């Protein structure tokens, strides 16, 4: 594709036309250049992957039962002793000296970030990263799970209020005759400064030491749309929470992936509220993914579970699989991560239940969605992008048409997909989805390679820019008439 010669671009934008039209052109060019390509997929150019992050290796250790996890492209156990995996989660006790308070109010590592040496923490964190991720060529998912406090003062409510209380006490003990307003101001400022430093410098350390890894914090960004019991619940993120997410630009700029979470309550099984809850959480993460200083949109991996939040062994219904995993894929996420705790492996019976579900309804649905995403990427985007809904609220999903495909489980535990997309299937995909091109590609079907990149990694063809200029100028002239 030929780029517009420098002289032509100058002719379009800087000829002595009315200032308003010139500003309009610059504004539109800036808007177009702000569109970011997707980061190249983490695994074999697959547009949507499934990763496993549960301690089911214990099923083999305790009961000699091997779980078949072949439907997952990436697998990692969160157990303390496991290392060298391609899905790594760092809990509070595994990465440096993370400060927090127990439920009894006992401080661990100083309790508050402003009470702990950041340099000592980072030195220990570097050792922990080398232990859990020994390979410098690690290119998997690196997730930091720090949930005891949030870096923004206003978000430390309920049980997290102890961090505000202790921060106030710290200031009042240091200074005599200080007003309540000054205590609040100083406590907030010192806490947020230290909290930011802890989170920002820790993830920067991870990215520097394992630069190919996809580093991010679990549950960030959060939509805080938990009021699912409200009448006429829409799932939308409260406006103040969207603004607070905007204020975390330092965190998004330090991350190389985003890891929001969608956990479903049993009381909302098969509910439309579950769909709304999931949809807005994923959509908010996708919004944030484009707001960073990176040349590409950060990949979004949505954490979910096999079962409901209160009963992890009561597995998600088919409808709730669609409302969580299917919704994530259709909106443009890079994949899902299935998380689980020791409940899944507490008995041989539980291990058997998990294995049975993964190799039946759950596995079949994962294969359905991941394969449909591949078909759509190949057909619409020439394997150079992922398919995203044209209308984000529409009930259109990346599913294989059962009239064209048949999914069956083989004796060795693998799922076999038979069939091919019909012309009608492909036409329906084209009608309902569009392409989000990967880095280095552009165009409606991502077939064109980007020959030169601006700040966003995108370029404009000469015909596109000329057409744009003509349209803007014509519009301006019609306004003048």
Curated annotation (Swiss-Prot):
It is a multi-pass membrane protein. It is found in: Membrane. The chain crosses the membrane at residues 12-32, 456-476. The keyword Disulfide bond applies. Disulfide bonds join 59-351, 223-237, 376-387, 381-435, 437-446. Glycans are attached at residues 64, 115, 232, 343. GO terms for molecular function: chondroitin hydrolase activity; hyalurononglucosaminidase activity. This is Hyaluronidase-4. The gene is Hyal4.
């Amino acid at each position: 594709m030929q780029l517009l010669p420098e002289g032509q671009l100058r002719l379009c934008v800087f000829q002595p036309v009315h200032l308003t039209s010139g500003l309009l052109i610059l504004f539109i060019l800036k808007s177009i250049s702000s569109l970011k390509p997707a980061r190249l997929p983490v695994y074999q150019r697959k547009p949507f992957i499934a990763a496993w992050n549960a301690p089911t290796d214990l099923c083999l250790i305790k009961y000699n039962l091997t779980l078949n996890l072949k439907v997952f492209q990436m697998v990692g156990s969160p157990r303390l002793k496991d290392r060298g995996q391609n899905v790594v989660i760092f809990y509070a006790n595994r990465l440096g000296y993370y400060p927090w308070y127990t439920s009894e109010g006992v401080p661990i590592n100083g309790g508050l970030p402003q009470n702990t040496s950041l340099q000592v923490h980072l030195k220990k964190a570097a050792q922990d990263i080398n232990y859990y991720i020994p390979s410098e060529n690690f290119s998997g998912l690196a997730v930091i799970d720090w949930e005891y406090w949030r870096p923004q003062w206003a978000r430390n409510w309920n049980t997290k209020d102890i961090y505000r209380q202790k921060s106030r006490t710290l200031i009042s003990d240091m200074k005599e005759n200080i007003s309540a307003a000054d205590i609040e101001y100083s406590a907030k400022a010192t806490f947020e400064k230290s909290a930011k430093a802890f989170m920002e410098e820790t993830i920067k350390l991870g990215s520097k030491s394992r630069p190919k890894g996809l580093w991010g914090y679990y549950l960030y960004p959060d939509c805080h749309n938990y009021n699912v019991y409200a009448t006429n619940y829409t799932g939308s993120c409260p406006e103040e929470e969207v603004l607070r997410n905007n204020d975390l630009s330092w965190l998004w700029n330090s991350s190389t992936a985003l890891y929001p979470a969608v956990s479903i309550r049993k009381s909302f099984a098969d509910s439309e509220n579950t769909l709304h809850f999931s949809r807005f959480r994923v959509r908010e993460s996708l919004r944030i993914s484009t707001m960073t200083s990176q040349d590409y949109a950060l990949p979004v991996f949505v954490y979910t579970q096999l079962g409901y939040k209160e009963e992890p062994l009561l597995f998600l219904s088919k409808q709730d699989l669609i409302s969580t995993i299917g919704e994530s894929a259709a909106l443009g996420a890079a994949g899902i991560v299935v998380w689980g705790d020791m409940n899944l492996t507490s008995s041989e019976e539980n291990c058997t239940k998990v294995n049975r579900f993964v190799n039946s309804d759950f596995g079949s649905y994962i294969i359905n969605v991941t394969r449909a995403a591949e078909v759509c990427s190949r057909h619409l985007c020439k394997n150079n992008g992922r398919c995203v809904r044209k209308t984000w609220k529409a009930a259109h999903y990346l599913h294989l048409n059962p009239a064209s495909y048949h999914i069956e489980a083989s004796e060795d535990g693998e799922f076999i997909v038979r069939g091919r997309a019909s012309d009608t299937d492909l036409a329906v995909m084209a009608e309902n989805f569009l392409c989000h091109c990967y880095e280095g590609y552009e165009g409606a079907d991502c077939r064109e390679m980007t020959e030169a990149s601006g700040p966003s990694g995108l370029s404009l063809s000469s015909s596109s820019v000329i057409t744009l200029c003509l349209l803007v100028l014509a519009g301006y002239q019609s306004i003048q008439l």
